[in-house]
């Protein structure tokens, strides 16, 4: 199971990654009718899947595109898309997105894909959740 999601938040990792922004929060588009009415909604955090070189490159982008900080978390301009894989999905009243994913991880950095073409929460629910 995979989706193309947008990087919206980052925080420093732990251990050998403590100096690098390597813990990421990803979002999918809401169900708005147009580009003006939809928004990015956080739905998953992922920490693994990138090479050390890719992580350093993403770290540099995060430092250049930070728009706000809250505690250890940096909010970044949504410019990067990643393909995320996960083992399962369930409905969740706890999460703003309405879904919880199991074992999310980054498969690849979608440098070829614009943010506007990232997946939507509606497509995630329709494809992966039973009716």
Describe every region a protein language model picked out:
Residues 1-131:
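Classical nucleotidyltransferase
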